[in-house]
Amino acid sequence: MKELKKIIEETYENKNKINLNNLDYEILQTIFRVIKLLNNGIIRISEKKDNTWITHEWLKKAVLLYIYIKENKFIEGSYTSYYDKVPLKYEKYNEKQFKKEKVRIVPPATIRYGAFINYNTIIMPSYINIGAYIDQGTMIDTWATIGSCAQIGKNVHISGGVGIGGVLEPLQNNPTIIEDNCFIGARSEIVEGVVIEKGCVISMGVFIGQSTKIYDRENGKIFYGRVPAHSVVVSGTLPSENRNYNLYAAIIVKKVDAKTLGKTEINQLLRNIK
């Protein structure tokens, strides 16, 4: 892996000098190999180590190089056609492969090559970009969009119309992360590298970016860039310093442990807010 990283780093530093008509074979195969490893979930853009999310910038560089060197090509679908640089993840799959991986892909879901979809997942008509990681037991509902490099954990429900932000550039920016056992309500937007920690319930229509105030009404704390584990969050407002107007905020209305979450319907959690 160190050798792959070295080649990618050196190539990216000299990307403006790349001759697309005479690209070095070793460089070409290295880029393709890295994207294949991402596609198969062997490596990932971001991973949690010692309770901290680490983003591998060199993998983002590999994705950018892949898009840079690829040419647009005709992509045939059963009901339409496409013209793009990045092929579709499942364009060469057969029934046996789908059954082996235990994934259900509902047309016209669009998943780009280089995104990883783990076992026992359901992908409704939605869009998943290159570099994204979708872990097992997760459902991506209709018209949801999962941006480039976004990380979605195990047993997550991404509801209809949800937007999970992607990031390739700037390279130092972290991807948006939804940890295990979370529920993201319909039409919500989680972007700009925000981390939704494990076991959270995000109500419908909640918008969270890096500058969004996330207010915990139980203790008065304000968070930025992350929602603490096991939080139930709704959209709301907080007063300005001069009290003349209110500004949008995400409000943590309660905490719910894993045992309670497993026994309680999501709608019940959101309705029982006082």
From Swiss-Prot:
GO terms for biological process: diaminopimelate biosynthetic process; lysine biosynthetic process via diaminopimelate. Substrate binds at R104, D141. GO terms for molecular function: 2,3,4,5-tetrahydropyridine-2,6-dicarboxylate N-succinyltransferase activity. It is found in: Cytoplasm. Its EC number is 2.3.1.117. GO terms for cellular component: cytoplasm. It catalyses: (S)-2,3,4,5-tetrahydrodipicolinate + succinyl-CoA + H2O = (S)-2-succinylamino-6-oxoheptanedioate + CoA. Pathway: Amino-acid biosynthesis; L-lysine biosynthesis via DAP pathway; LL-2,6-diaminopimelate from (S)-tetrahydrodipicolinate (succinylase route): step 1/3. It comes from the Bacteria. Transmembrane segments: none annotated. Keywords: Acyltransferase, Amino-acid biosynthesis, Cytoplasm, Diaminopimelate biosynthesis, Lysine biosynthesis, Repeat, Transferase. It holds the Pfam family Hexapep_2. It is an enzyme of class 2 (transferase). Belongs to the transferase hexapeptide repeat family. HAMAP family: DapD. Homotrimer. This is 2,3,4,5-tetrahydropyridine-2,6-dicarboxylate N-succinyltransferase. It comes from Buchnera aphidicola subsp. Acyrthosiphon pisum (strain APS) (Acyrthosiphon pisum symbiotic bacterium). The gene is dapD.
